[in-house]
Amino acid sequence: MIDDILEQVQNGSLTAVEAKKKLESYENLGFVKIDHHRKRRQGFPEIVFGEGKTAEQILTIVQSLRIRNDSVLVTRISLEKAVFVQNVCSDFEYNEIARTLAWVKEKPKSIGAYIAIVCAGTSDLAVAEEAAVTAETLGIPVRRIYDVGVAGLHRLLDNIDEIRSATVSVCVAGMEGALPSVLGGLVTNPIIAVPTSIGYGANFNGLSALLSMLNSCASGVSVVNIDNGFGAAYNAALIYKLVHEKEINDDEDIIF
């Protein structure tokens, strides 16, 4: 990217002032400082957490992000706020189940690999879809394998080959949170477990599932916070990029 900017300055298609603006690490908009070098430092652009922000603030942020990035993602955004943004940015797509608002400039070329999003039950879909949309917006192919919880293990076994073929799996479960441990004993790829807040009384809004996953006897299972589909998918995407870096060919300059 830096070489391209310098070349544009040299041939006159970009002024020095414009080049300086493009190379700035962040943009100060008063209420927010947008990190434009996030992708160069960490591999993916800055993601917007929608809760607690006004629709106007979200719109301002995404309009800035899309100028310098190939994708933009807002998580935990209500339908009302999403519609406000879409009235200006009509090419942004809202996923009502995941509560995400996403824009992708163009889909990356497929290399045949993928992340598996494994979900225990339909009640966990909001978290699973947040994970799936996050990975897809970051340019990572996804296979959705839903409603394969431990109450009907035959459903999981019917899909086990597809899960085994994934580079990494995100496993979402509520109630007692048993699915990641079961899956961990069946596959060789790493599993990122996501406890959800779905369950009755002693589930304690996901605490019981979280503790079950943290105490898993199965090797290869790591755990993120309750309902954090985004965090699981982000880490899965980092693993995917490391494994497939030669095929992906990401030539972004790293700037500290």
Question: What name fits each language-model region?
Answer:
Residues 111-152:
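Glycine-rich phosphate/diphosphate-binding loop of Rossmann-like nucleotide-binding domains
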Residues 158-196:
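Glycine-rich phosphate-binding loop
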Residues 93-95, 183-206, 254-256:
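Short, acidic/small-residue loops that bind anionic groups at enzyme active sites
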Residues 56-58, 124-129, 153, 173-183, ...:
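Short glycine/serine/threonine-rich phosphate/pyrophosphate-binding segments
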Residues 100-102, 141-162, 207-208, 224:
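Glycine-rich oxoanion-binding loops at beta->alpha junctions
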Residues 1-78, 87-88, 92:
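Long amphipathic alpha-helical segments
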Residues 119, 123, 161-164, 168, ...:
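C-terminal binding/interaction regions
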